[in-house]
Amino acid sequence: MPYLLEMKNITKTFGSVKAIDNVSLRLNAGEIVSLCGENGSGKSTLMKVLCGIYPHGSYEGEIIFAGEEIQASHIRDTERKGIAIIHQELALVKELTVLENIFLGNEITHNGIMDYDLMTLRCQKLLAQVSLSISPDTRVGDLGLGQQQLVEIAKALNKQVRLLILDEPTASLTEQETSVLLDIIRDLQQHGIACIYISHKLNEVKAISDTICVIRDGQHIGTRDAAGMSEDDIITMMVGRELTALYPNEPHTTGDEILRIEHLTAWHPVNRHIKRVNDVSFSLKRGEILGIAGLVGAGRTETIQCLFGVWPGQWEGKIYIDGKQVDIRNCQQAIAQGIAMVPEDRKRDGIVPVMAVGKNITLAALKKFTGSISQLDDAAEQKCILESIQQLKVKTSSPDLAIGRLSGGNQQKAILARCLLLNPRILILDEPTRGIDIGAKYEIYKLINQLVQQGIAVIVISSELPEVLGLSDRVLVMHEGKLKANLINHNLTQEQVMEAALRSEHHVEKQSV
Protein backbone atom coordinates (compact mmCIF):
# COMPACT_ATOMS: atom_id res chain seq x y z
CA MET A 1 0.00 0.00 0.00
CA PRO A 2 1.53 3.38 -1.00
CA TYR A 3 2.31 5.95 1.66
CA LEU A 4 0.02 8.94 2.09
CA LEU A 5 3.07 11.20 2.50
CA GLU A 6 6.70 10.84 1.51
CA MET A 7 9.22 13.59 2.10
CA LYS A 8 12.45 12.52 0.43
CA ASN A 9 15.90 13.95 1.21
CA ILE A 10 14.70 17.42 2.18
CA THR A 11 17.44 20.03 2.63
CA LYS A 12 16.72 23.65 3.49
CA THR A 13 19.44 26.25 3.91
CA PHE A 14 19.48 29.82 5.19
CA GLY A 15 22.66 31.37 3.85
CA SER A 16 25.42 28.95 4.77
CA VAL A 17 23.42 27.29 7.56
CA LYS A 18 21.60 24.00 6.90
CA ALA A 19 18.40 24.13 8.94
CA ILE A 20 17.32 20.77 7.48
CA ASP A 21 19.93 18.35 6.14
CA ASN A 22 18.75 15.44 3.96
CA VAL A 23 15.72 14.55 6.10
CA SER A 24 13.12 11.99 4.99
CA LEU A 25 9.71 11.36 6.54
CA ARG A 26 6.85 9.08 5.53
CA LEU A 27 3.50 8.07 6.94
CA ASN A 28 0.39 6.10 6.03
CA ALA A 29 -3.24 7.17 5.99
CA GLY A 30 -4.61 7.09 9.53
CA GLU A 31 -1.14 6.97 11.09
CA ILE A 32 -0.09 9.27 13.94
CA VAL A 33 3.58 10.22 13.79
CA SER A 34 5.12 12.34 16.54
CA LEU A 35 7.94 14.60 15.43
CA CYS A 36 10.33 15.12 18.34
CA GLY A 37 13.40 17.29 18.78
CA GLU A 38 14.76 20.16 20.79
CA ASN A 39 13.85 23.74 19.89
CA GLY A 40 15.96 24.70 16.90
CA SER A 41 16.31 21.09 15.76
CA GLY A 42 14.47 21.77 12.49
CA LYS A 43 10.95 20.47 13.18
CA SER A 44 9.19 23.72 12.32
CA THR A 45 11.34 24.26 9.21
CA LEU A 46 10.45 20.79 7.95
CA MET A 47 6.74 21.43 8.47
CA LYS A 48 6.95 24.81 6.73
CA VAL A 49 8.50 23.06 3.73
CA LEU A 50 5.69 20.49 3.76
CA CYS A 51 2.94 23.12 3.99
CA GLY A 52 4.28 25.39 1.25
CA ILE A 53 5.24 28.22 3.58
CA TYR A 54 8.70 27.69 2.13
CA PRO A 55 7.79 27.30 -1.56
CA HIS A 56 9.03 24.70 -4.01
CA GLY A 57 12.41 25.75 -5.33
CA SER A 58 13.59 27.18 -2.01
CA TYR A 59 14.61 23.71 -0.79
CA GLU A 60 16.09 20.50 -2.16
CA GLY A 61 14.24 17.20 -2.15
CA GLU A 62 10.87 15.79 -3.13
CA ILE A 63 7.42 15.71 -1.51
CA ILE A 64 4.87 13.13 -2.64
CA PHE A 65 1.34 13.26 -1.23
CA ALA A 66 -1.39 10.76 -2.16
CA GLY A 67 0.75 9.53 -5.05
CA GLU A 68 1.39 12.97 -6.57
CA GLU A 69 4.43 15.21 -6.30
CA ILE A 70 3.67 18.50 -4.56
CA GLN A 71 5.33 21.65 -5.87
CA ALA A 72 3.54 24.18 -3.69
CA SER A 73 4.20 27.89 -4.01
CA HIS A 74 1.80 28.86 -1.19
CA ILE A 75 0.11 27.28 1.83
CA ARG A 76 -3.21 27.42 -0.04
CA ASP A 77 -1.80 24.90 -2.53
CA THR A 78 -1.24 22.28 0.16
CA GLU A 79 -4.57 23.05 1.84
CA ARG A 80 -6.32 22.18 -1.43
CA LYS A 81 -4.49 18.84 -1.36
CA GLY A 82 -5.81 18.13 2.15
CA ILE A 83 -2.85 19.17 4.34
CA ALA A 84 -3.64 21.48 7.27
CA ILE A 85 -1.40 22.81 10.03
CA ILE A 86 -2.53 24.17 13.40
CA HIS A 87 0.16 26.26 15.06
CA GLN A 88 0.70 26.73 18.79
CA GLU A 89 -0.33 30.36 18.30
CA LEU A 90 -3.88 29.83 17.07
CA ALA A 91 -4.86 31.60 13.83
CA LEU A 92 -8.45 32.39 14.77
CA VAL A 93 -10.04 35.85 14.60
CA LYS A 94 -11.38 36.32 18.13
CA GLU A 95 -13.85 39.05 17.13
CA LEU A 96 -15.62 36.73 14.66
CA THR A 97 -18.04 33.90 15.42
CA VAL A 98 -17.18 30.22 15.33
CA LEU A 99 -19.03 29.86 12.01
CA GLU A 100 -17.26 32.85 10.47
CA ASN A 101 -13.86 31.49 11.50
CA ILE A 102 -14.52 28.00 10.19
CA PHE A 103 -15.63 29.27 6.78
CA LEU A 104 -13.23 32.22 6.54
CA GLY A 105 -11.95 32.15 2.95
CA ASN A 106 -14.10 29.10 2.19
CA GLU A 107 -17.61 30.58 2.33
CA ILE A 108 -20.49 28.71 0.69
CA THR A 109 -22.15 31.01 -1.83
CA HIS A 110 -24.93 30.91 -4.41
CA ASN A 111 -24.86 33.58 -7.10
CA GLY A 112 -22.39 35.58 -5.03
CA ILE A 113 -24.55 35.50 -1.87
CA MET A 114 -23.40 33.57 1.20
CA ASP A 115 -25.70 30.71 2.19
CA TYR A 116 -25.77 31.09 5.98
CA ASP A 117 -28.36 28.34 6.45
CA LEU A 118 -26.18 25.78 4.70
CA MET A 119 -23.04 27.00 6.47
CA THR A 120 -24.80 26.80 9.85
CA LEU A 121 -25.88 23.22 9.17
CA ARG A 122 -22.39 22.28 8.03
CA CYS A 123 -20.84 24.06 11.04
CA GLN A 124 -23.06 22.16 13.48
CA LYS A 125 -21.94 18.85 11.96
CA LEU A 126 -18.27 19.86 12.17
CA LEU A 127 -18.62 20.93 15.81
CA ALA A 128 -20.31 17.63 16.64
CA GLN A 129 -17.42 15.82 14.96
CA VAL A 130 -14.99 17.43 17.42
CA SER A 131 -17.36 16.98 20.39
CA LEU A 132 -17.91 20.71 20.82
CA SER A 133 -21.36 21.64 22.14
CA ILE A 134 -21.50 25.35 21.35
CA SER A 135 -23.53 27.58 19.06
CA PRO A 136 -22.01 28.46 15.66
CA ASP A 137 -22.82 32.08 16.54
CA THR A 138 -20.56 32.07 19.62
CA ARG A 139 -17.79 34.67 19.49
CA VAL A 140 -14.43 32.85 19.41
CA GLY A 141 -12.92 35.30 21.92
CA ASP A 142 -15.46 34.06 24.49
CA LEU A 143 -14.17 30.47 24.26
CA GLY A 144 -11.46 28.86 26.34
CA LEU A 145 -8.17 27.82 24.74
CA GLY A 146 -9.20 24.16 24.63
CA GLN A 147 -12.41 25.00 22.79
CA GLN A 148 -10.54 27.30 20.40
CA GLN A 149 -8.17 24.44 19.60
CA LEU A 150 -11.15 22.26 18.65
CA VAL A 151 -12.56 25.06 16.47
CA GLU A 152 -9.23 25.06 14.61
CA ILE A 153 -9.59 21.32 14.01
CA ALA A 154 -13.18 21.80 12.81
CA LYS A 155 -11.87 24.47 10.44
CA ALA A 156 -9.32 21.99 9.09
CA LEU A 157 -11.98 19.30 8.68
CA ASN A 158 -14.04 21.75 6.64
CA LYS A 159 -11.16 21.79 4.15
CA GLN A 160 -11.42 18.01 3.68
CA VAL A 161 -8.17 17.46 5.55
CA ARG A 162 -6.29 14.19 5.01
CA LEU A 163 -3.16 15.11 6.97
CA LEU A 164 -3.41 17.22 10.13
CA ILE A 165 -0.26 18.79 11.59
CA LEU A 166 -0.53 19.83 15.25
CA ASP A 167 2.31 21.99 16.61
CA GLU A 168 2.39 22.03 20.44
CA PRO A 169 -1.42 21.73 20.61
CA THR A 170 -1.64 21.24 24.39
CA ALA A 171 0.95 23.80 25.58
CA SER A 172 -1.76 26.00 27.15
CA LEU A 173 -4.43 23.37 27.83
CA THR A 174 -5.57 21.79 31.09
CA GLU A 175 -5.24 18.04 31.63
CA GLN A 176 -8.96 17.60 30.94
CA GLU A 177 -8.79 19.66 27.73
CA THR A 178 -5.71 17.69 26.67
CA SER A 179 -7.53 14.40 27.24
CA VAL A 180 -10.45 15.59 25.08
CA LEU A 181 -8.09 16.68 22.30
CA LEU A 182 -6.23 13.36 22.26
CA ASP A 183 -9.56 11.50 22.06
CA ILE A 184 -10.55 13.66 19.06
CA ILE A 185 -7.27 12.86 17.31
CA ARG A 186 -7.83 9.13 17.89
CA ASP A 187 -11.34 9.46 16.46
CA LEU A 188 -10.01 11.24 13.36
CA GLN A 189 -7.50 8.42 13.00
CA GLN A 190 -10.38 5.94 12.77
CA HIS A 191 -11.68 7.95 9.80
CA GLY A 192 -8.36 7.61 7.98
CA ILE A 193 -6.97 11.06 8.79
CA ALA A 194 -3.22 11.02 9.41
CA CYS A 195 -1.56 13.28 11.96
CA ILE A 196 1.90 14.71 12.55
CA TYR A 197 2.02 15.56 16.26
CA ILE A 198 4.70 17.93 17.60
CA SER A 199 5.03 18.18 21.37
CA HIS A 200 7.63 18.44 24.13
CA LYS A 201 5.30 16.53 26.48
CA LEU A 202 6.68 13.04 26.11
CA ASN A 203 3.85 11.39 28.04
CA GLU A 204 1.46 12.65 25.34
CA VAL A 205 3.83 11.57 22.59
CA LYS A 206 3.87 8.04 24.02
CA ALA A 207 0.10 7.99 24.54
CA ILE A 208 -0.94 9.16 21.06
CA SER A 209 1.74 7.97 18.62
CA ASP A 210 2.06 4.99 16.33
CA THR A 211 5.53 6.09 15.26
CA ILE A 212 8.09 8.53 16.66
CA CYS A 213 10.52 10.43 14.43
CA VAL A 214 13.41 12.31 16.05
CA ILE A 215 15.32 15.22 14.50
CA ARG A 216 18.48 16.71 16.00
CA ASP A 217 20.49 19.63 14.59
CA GLY A 218 18.57 19.44 11.32
CA GLN A 219 19.29 15.76 10.76
CA HIS A 220 17.07 12.69 10.95
CA ILE A 221 18.24 10.65 13.94
CA GLY A 222 15.73 7.82 13.71
CA THR A 223 12.13 6.68 13.32
CA ARG A 224 10.79 3.90 15.56
CA ASP A 225 7.55 2.30 16.68
CA ALA A 226 6.25 4.18 19.71
CA ALA A 227 5.38 0.96 21.53
CA GLY A 228 9.05 0.00 21.68
CA MET A 229 10.34 3.32 23.03
CA SER A 230 10.50 4.69 26.55
CA GLU A 231 10.58 8.39 27.40
CA ASP A 232 14.28 7.98 28.25
CA ASP A 233 14.90 6.53 24.77
CA ILE A 234 13.25 9.57 23.17
CA ILE A 235 15.25 11.99 25.33
CA THR A 236 18.54 10.28 24.49
CA MET A 237 17.79 10.50 20.76
CA MET A 238 16.72 14.15 21.07
CA VAL A 239 19.68 15.51 23.04
CA GLY A 240 22.39 13.05 21.99
CA ARG A 241 23.16 12.03 25.55
CA GLU A 242 21.48 10.47 28.55
CA LEU A 243 19.98 12.80 31.14
CA THR A 244 20.61 10.75 34.26
CA ALA A 245 18.11 12.76 36.30
CA LEU A 246 15.80 15.38 34.82
CA TYR A 247 15.38 17.13 38.17
CA PRO A 248 18.69 17.91 39.94
CA ASN A 249 18.82 16.21 43.31
CA GLU A 250 21.65 18.25 44.80
CA PRO A 251 21.15 18.96 48.52
CA HIS A 252 20.53 22.52 49.62
CA THR A 253 19.73 23.99 53.00
CA THR A 254 17.05 26.52 53.78
CA GLY A 255 17.60 29.56 55.97
CA ASP A 256 15.32 31.78 57.96
CA GLU A 257 12.04 33.24 56.73
CA ILE A 258 12.37 35.87 54.00
CA LEU A 259 8.72 36.27 52.95
CA ARG A 260 5.38 35.99 54.70
CA ILE A 261 1.96 36.71 53.24
CA GLU A 262 -1.05 37.00 55.55
CA HIS A 263 -4.74 36.89 54.63
CA LEU A 264 -4.31 37.79 50.96
CA THR A 265 -7.62 38.33 49.16
CA ALA A 266 -7.89 39.52 45.55
CA TRP A 267 -11.02 40.44 43.63
CA HIS A 268 -11.86 40.06 39.96
CA PRO A 269 -10.73 43.21 38.07
CA VAL A 270 -14.25 43.82 36.70
CA ASN A 271 -16.66 41.97 39.01
CA ARG A 272 -15.91 43.00 42.61
CA HIS A 273 -18.20 40.23 43.89
CA ILE A 274 -15.85 37.48 42.65
CA LYS A 275 -12.82 36.58 44.77
CA ARG A 276 -9.93 35.18 42.71
CA VAL A 277 -7.81 34.71 45.86
CA ASN A 278 -9.54 34.07 49.17
CA ASP A 279 -7.72 34.61 52.50
CA VAL A 280 -4.40 32.97 51.54
CA SER A 281 -1.45 32.94 53.96
CA PHE A 282 1.97 31.32 53.55
CA SER A 283 5.70 31.86 54.14
CA LEU A 284 8.94 31.30 52.23
CA LYS A 285 12.48 30.64 53.49
CA ARG A 286 15.83 31.60 52.04
CA GLY A 287 17.15 28.87 49.74
CA GLU A 288 13.74 27.18 49.53
CA ILE A 289 11.86 26.12 46.41
CA LEU A 290 8.15 26.57 47.06
CA GLY A 291 5.86 24.99 44.48
CA ILE A 292 2.27 26.14 43.98
CA ALA A 293 -0.03 23.54 42.43
CA GLY A 294 -3.69 23.56 41.48
CA LEU A 295 -6.14 23.27 38.64
CA VAL A 296 -6.81 26.11 36.21
CA GLY A 297 -8.68 28.86 38.08
CA ALA A 298 -7.10 27.90 41.40
CA GLY A 299 -5.73 31.41 41.94
CA ARG A 300 -2.01 30.57 41.69
CA THR A 301 -1.05 33.23 39.15
CA GLU A 302 -3.32 35.82 40.79
CA THR A 303 -1.55 35.25 44.12
CA ILE A 304 1.93 35.92 42.80
CA GLN A 305 0.72 38.83 40.65
CA CYS A 306 -0.40 40.51 43.88
CA LEU A 307 3.03 39.82 45.38
CA PHE A 308 4.74 41.34 42.32
CA GLY A 309 2.38 44.33 42.21
CA VAL A 310 0.83 43.60 38.81
CA TRP A 311 -2.63 42.26 39.71
CA PRO A 312 -5.05 44.56 37.82
CA GLY A 313 -7.85 44.30 40.38
CA GLN A 314 -8.16 45.27 44.02
CA TRP A 315 -6.56 43.18 46.75
CA GLU A 316 -5.88 43.32 50.46
CA GLY A 317 -3.62 41.52 52.87
CA LYS A 318 -0.18 41.92 54.43
CA ILE A 319 3.22 41.22 52.88
CA TYR A 320 6.28 40.90 55.11
CA ILE A 321 9.87 40.75 53.84
CA ASP A 322 12.58 40.07 56.41
CA GLY A 323 9.91 40.51 59.07
CA LYS A 324 8.96 44.03 58.00
CA GLN A 325 5.61 44.85 56.43
CA VAL A 326 5.99 46.29 52.92
CA ASP A 327 3.56 47.89 50.50
CA ILE A 328 3.86 46.59 46.93
CA ARG A 329 1.49 48.13 44.40
CA ASN A 330 3.59 47.97 41.23
CA CYS A 331 6.48 45.98 39.80
CA GLN A 332 8.99 48.76 40.51
CA GLN A 333 8.22 48.48 44.23
CA ALA A 334 8.52 44.69 44.02
CA ILE A 335 11.92 44.92 42.31
CA ALA A 336 13.06 47.40 44.96
CA GLN A 337 12.23 44.75 47.58
CA GLY A 338 14.40 42.18 45.78
CA ILE A 339 11.61 40.32 43.94
CA ALA A 340 11.88 39.30 40.27
CA MET A 341 9.37 37.37 38.19
CA VAL A 342 9.30 35.30 35.01
CA PRO A 343 5.68 35.71 33.79
CA GLU A 344 3.32 32.96 32.67
CA ASP A 345 2.96 34.23 29.09
CA ARG A 346 6.44 35.12 27.88
CA LYS A 347 5.31 36.36 24.46
CA ARG A 348 2.70 38.72 25.91
CA ASP A 349 4.34 39.80 29.17
CA GLY A 350 7.98 38.70 29.06
CA ILE A 351 9.63 39.95 25.88
CA VAL A 352 9.57 42.77 23.36
CA PRO A 353 9.70 40.56 20.22
CA VAL A 354 11.17 43.15 17.82
CA MET A 355 13.82 44.31 20.29
CA ALA A 356 17.30 42.78 20.34
CA VAL A 357 18.10 39.86 22.63
CA GLY A 358 20.63 41.98 24.52
CA LYS A 359 18.26 44.91 25.02
CA ASN A 360 15.59 42.53 26.33
CA ILE A 361 18.07 41.20 28.88
CA THR A 362 19.06 44.63 30.25
CA LEU A 363 15.60 46.20 29.96
CA ALA A 364 14.83 46.16 33.70
CA ALA A 365 18.35 46.99 34.88
CA LEU A 366 19.33 50.04 32.82
CA LYS A 367 20.14 51.98 36.00
CA LYS A 368 23.17 49.71 36.36
CA PHE A 369 24.64 51.21 33.21
CA THR A 370 23.58 54.82 33.70
CA GLY A 371 26.00 57.37 35.12
CA SER A 372 25.35 60.50 37.12
CA ILE A 373 24.47 62.46 33.97
CA SER A 374 21.92 59.81 32.91
CA GLN A 375 24.04 58.66 29.98
CA LEU A 376 24.05 54.96 29.14
CA ASP A 377 27.44 53.25 29.35
CA ASP A 378 27.20 51.16 26.17
CA ALA A 379 30.45 49.28 26.79
CA ALA A 380 29.39 48.20 30.28
CA GLU A 381 25.97 47.16 28.99
CA GLN A 382 27.44 45.09 26.14
CA LYS A 383 29.88 43.39 28.52
CA CYS A 384 27.01 42.47 30.83
CA ILE A 385 24.89 41.20 27.91
CA LEU A 386 27.65 38.89 26.68
CA GLU A 387 28.27 37.57 30.21
CA SER A 388 24.53 36.90 30.70
CA ILE A 389 24.23 35.12 27.35
CA GLN A 390 27.21 32.94 28.24
CA GLN A 391 26.02 32.23 31.79
CA LEU A 392 22.49 31.25 30.74
CA LYS A 393 23.65 29.51 27.53
CA VAL A 394 21.30 31.57 25.36
CA LYS A 395 21.68 30.30 21.79
CA THR A 396 21.67 33.31 19.48
CA SER A 397 23.71 34.24 16.43
CA SER A 398 24.08 37.77 17.80
CA PRO A 399 22.99 39.84 20.83
CA ASP A 400 21.48 42.22 18.27
CA LEU A 401 19.12 39.60 16.82
CA ALA A 402 15.42 40.27 17.50
CA ILE A 403 14.44 38.06 20.44
CA GLY A 404 11.23 37.05 18.66
CA ARG A 405 13.37 34.97 16.29
CA LEU A 406 14.72 32.77 19.10
CA SER A 407 13.21 29.47 20.18
CA GLY A 408 10.90 29.46 23.20
CA GLY A 409 13.59 27.95 25.41
CA ASN A 410 16.13 30.62 24.53
CA GLN A 411 13.56 33.39 25.01
CA GLN A 412 12.91 31.97 28.48
CA LYS A 413 16.63 31.91 29.28
CA ALA A 414 16.90 35.57 28.22
CA ILE A 415 14.03 36.49 30.56
CA LEU A 416 15.79 34.60 33.38
CA ALA A 417 18.99 36.48 32.57
CA ARG A 418 17.07 39.76 32.91
CA CYS A 419 15.74 38.67 36.31
CA LEU A 420 19.20 37.70 37.56
CA LEU A 421 20.60 41.12 36.62
CA LEU A 422 18.28 42.50 39.30
CA ASN A 423 20.12 40.44 41.97
CA PRO A 424 16.83 39.10 43.35
CA ARG A 425 16.38 37.59 46.77
CA ILE A 426 13.02 36.12 45.75
CA LEU A 427 12.51 34.71 42.24
CA ILE A 428 9.00 33.89 41.00
CA LEU A 429 8.75 31.46 38.09
CA ASP A 430 5.26 31.15 36.57
CA GLU A 431 5.14 28.21 34.12
CA PRO A 432 8.94 28.39 33.65
CA THR A 433 9.20 25.58 31.07
CA ARG A 434 5.92 25.87 29.15
CA GLY A 435 6.42 25.04 25.47
CA ILE A 436 10.17 24.44 25.65
CA ASP A 437 12.13 21.30 24.87
CA ILE A 438 13.53 18.73 27.26
CA GLY A 439 17.14 19.91 26.92
CA ALA A 440 16.26 23.53 27.74
CA LYS A 441 14.10 22.32 30.66
CA TYR A 442 17.05 20.42 32.08
CA GLU A 443 19.28 23.52 31.89
CA ILE A 444 16.62 25.68 33.60
CA TYR A 445 16.17 23.09 36.37
CA LYS A 446 19.93 23.08 36.99
CA LEU A 447 19.93 26.88 37.14
CA ILE A 448 17.10 26.90 39.70
CA ASN A 449 19.07 24.47 41.84
CA GLN A 450 22.18 26.67 41.62
CA LEU A 451 20.18 29.75 42.64
CA VAL A 452 18.75 28.19 45.79
CA GLN A 453 22.23 27.03 46.78
CA GLN A 454 23.17 30.73 46.71
CA GLY A 455 20.33 31.45 49.15
CA ILE A 456 17.79 32.80 46.65
CA ALA A 457 14.21 31.82 47.50
CA VAL A 458 12.22 30.50 44.54
CA ILE A 459 8.48 30.18 43.95
CA VAL A 460 7.52 27.82 41.11
CA ILE A 461 4.06 27.68 39.58
CA SER A 462 3.47 24.94 37.03
CA SER A 463 0.53 23.12 35.48
CA GLU A 464 2.80 20.07 35.18
CA LEU A 465 2.62 18.29 38.53
CA PRO A 466 5.76 16.20 37.91
CA GLU A 467 7.67 19.48 37.54
CA VAL A 468 6.29 20.88 40.82
CA LEU A 469 7.07 17.64 42.66
CA GLY A 470 10.49 17.24 41.04
CA LEU A 471 11.69 20.72 42.04
CA SER A 472 9.95 21.77 45.24
CA ASP A 473 10.89 21.44 48.90
CA ARG A 474 7.32 22.31 49.85
CA VAL A 475 4.06 22.46 47.87
CA LEU A 476 1.11 24.80 48.36
CA VAL A 477 -2.09 23.37 46.91
CA MET A 478 -4.75 25.86 45.82
CA HIS A 479 -8.30 25.35 44.59
CA GLU A 480 -10.85 27.99 43.59
CA GLY A 481 -8.82 30.78 45.19
CA LYS A 482 -8.27 29.05 48.53
CA LEU A 483 -5.15 27.48 50.00
CA LYS A 484 -6.16 23.85 50.58
CA ALA A 485 -2.85 22.36 51.73
CA ASN A 486 0.74 23.20 52.66
CA LEU A 487 2.70 19.99 52.15
CA ILE A 488 6.30 19.05 52.88
CA ASN A 489 7.63 17.26 49.80
CA HIS A 490 8.61 13.94 51.34
CA ASN A 491 8.05 11.75 48.25
CA LEU A 492 4.74 13.45 47.50
CA THR A 493 2.70 11.89 44.70
CA GLN A 494 0.45 13.51 42.09
CA GLU A 495 -2.50 11.67 43.61
CA GLN A 496 -1.84 13.19 47.05
CA VAL A 497 -1.69 16.69 45.58
CA MET A 498 -4.94 16.25 43.64
CA GLU A 499 -6.64 14.76 46.70
CA ALA A 500 -5.55 17.79 48.72
CA ALA A 501 -6.90 20.16 46.06
CA LEU A 502 -10.32 18.54 46.03
CA ARG A 503 -10.85 17.75 49.72
CA SER A 504 -13.18 20.06 51.62
CA GLU A 505 -10.98 20.93 54.60
CA HIS A 506 -7.68 22.81 54.75
CA HIS A 507 -4.63 20.67 55.54
CA VAL A 508 -1.21 21.83 56.69
CA GLU A 509 1.84 19.71 57.52
CA LYS A 510 3.60 21.48 60.36
CA GLN A 511 7.02 19.82 60.09
CA SER A 512 9.92 22.13 59.41
CA VAL A 513 11.56 21.91 56.03
UniProtKB/Swiss-Prot annotation:
Its EC number is 7.5.2.10. It is found in: Cell inner membrane. Keywords: ATP-binding, Cell inner membrane, Cell membrane, Membrane, Nucleotide-binding, Repeat, Sugar transport, Translocase, Transport. Its main location: membrane. CDD domains: ABC_Carb_Monos_I (cd03216), ABC_Carb_Monos_II (cd03215). Residues 5-242, 259-505 form the ABC transporter domain. One of its GO terms (cellular component) is plasma membrane. It is an enzyme of class 7 (translocase). It catalyses: D-xylose(out) + ATP + H2O = D-xylose(in) + ADP + phosphate + H(+). It comes from the Bacteria. InterPro entries: AAA+_ATPase, ABC_carbohydrate_import_ATPase, ABC_transporter-like_ATP-bd, ABC_transporter-like_CS, ABC_transptr_XylG, P-loop_NTPase. The complex is composed of two ATP-binding proteins (XylG), two transmembrane proteins (XylH) and a solute-binding protein (XylF). Part of the ABC transporter complex XylFGH involved in xylose import. Responsible for energy coupling to the transport system. Belongs to the ABC transporter superfamily. Xylose importer (TC 3.A.1.2.4) family. This is Xylose import ATP-binding protein XylG. The gene is xylG.
